[in-house]
């Protein structure tokens, strides 16, 4: 298996309360099954508030409600997560732990990316003065999870990726504003 990441991937670190456009508002917040089961046993006021705010989604999964302003019910006035504060990083659901990181597996490649929907990722990406490069590392072992990607979809994904890489490599403007 080959793991491919943009060269700035490891530079990302969540800026939490300093973020002006929090990922904890305006989004549907899904809860994976393991987190859902853990939240059922979480003690205290935070656990109670979390359980009251959970709901079943149309597909049988679970989510966390948002308030009237679209903010996650666990997001406090300082734009910090009360669940994280009370129970630590390990208590967060997969979507909260992973975002803005995401990946797709196809053929023998795991492509990891950072979403430009995140303010800090944008800051990192647009402050680069050199074209983005992709770093590959070969891992041993077979992947059994291709995320249901068909051969046509994998070919299309690789073609789009080649085009985007070409655009990144052609970029020569030293000013992030010119980008």
Show the residue positions of the predicted features.
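Hydrophobic scaffolds flanking metal-cofactor catalytic centers in soluble metalloenzymes
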Residues: 1-139, 149, 155-156, 160
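Hydrophobic, Leu/Ile/Phe/Ala-enriched alpha-helical segments that form helix-helix packing faces
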Residues: 43, 164-171
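Intrinsically disordered, low-complexity regulatory regions
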Residues: 143, 161-166
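Glycine- and acidic
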Residues: 146
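Conserved small/polar residues in nucleotide/adenosyl-binding loops
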Residues: 171-178
